[in-house]
Amino acid sequence: MVSQRILCLAMALSLAGLSQPSSAAEAPASAPAPECAANAPLDTRVEAVLAKTDRSDKQRANDTNRLSETRFVLAHVKPGDHVLDMGAGEGYASMLLSAAVCTGSVDSQNPQGWVDFYKMSAARDAMAAARPNVHLLTTEFTAILKPAAPYDVIFIGTIYHDTYNEKGQDAVAMDKALLADLKPGGLVILTDHKTVDGAGISATNTLHRIDKAQVLSDFKAAGVELVEDSNVLANPADDHAKIVFDPSIRGKTDRMALVFRRPL
């Protein structure tokens, strides 16, 4: 009798064990970061990338002035994208793009002269250490190495005018070389400080501004189509007569916000 009771108890315990789900089955799948969730609203993505705790106080200090540009750029970037951030400086936009592309990657480019003159090395190295999906490119605008895979997006943030200040620069040739590294259907997102209509490139090295008509002409000649010409960064109060670093207008200049697409 005792042996029968022991046998029954053993069987009951065994069945009870079989009925319990394993701890692995109980563990829920980890949710993606808010900026990486499928179909996440733009506001959610922007708030999430700005909230990253590894961003410096210097970067955060620019968030208010650059919010409209950030929203404009991130509206055209998605998780998994491979992005070139051209003339990236210390990496304000590169950090935001790094979070926004999630499993994608960002090539953060600067000419060596910029890195040396503006003493960017420490900030760039810190960014690359904090964000494994950011790769530093230190090369001239006309010598950007061909990526292993074509870019989904090329971002040229308020520095296109600077490319005209490089000796021997051929803007259209540079644009064509960049577009060769962009996948068919890929986007070029460009913002820059506007000068008075008809000024062409006369103020690129003095006021650090460029005529929007010049930019449109350059990229048309390079073979891309304009798909968006937004006024999101417009400021009618800017008289276009001041250098963009003037304290009265810095961060509030009248800027173009353009999106070009490489044909399929």
Question: Where are each of the predicted segments found?
Answer:
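A short acidic, Gly/Pro-enriched loop at the edge of an enzyme's catalytic core
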Residues: 144-154
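Class I SAM-dependent methyltransferase Rossmann-like catalytic core
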Residues: 41-78
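Helix-to-beta-strand junctions that scaffold the AdoMet/dcAdoMet cofactor pocket
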Residues: 78, 101-102, 182-184
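Glycine-rich SAM-binding Motif I of class I
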Residues: 91-95
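Conserved beta-strand signature within the Rossmann-like core of class I S-adenosyl-L-methionine
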Residues: 185-193
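A short glycine-rich, Lys/Arg-flanked "PGG" loop and its adjoining helix->strand segment in the class I
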Residues: 170-184
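Core SAM-dependent methyltransferase catalytic element
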Residues: 237-264
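Conserved class I S-adenosyl-L-methionine
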Residues: 80-89
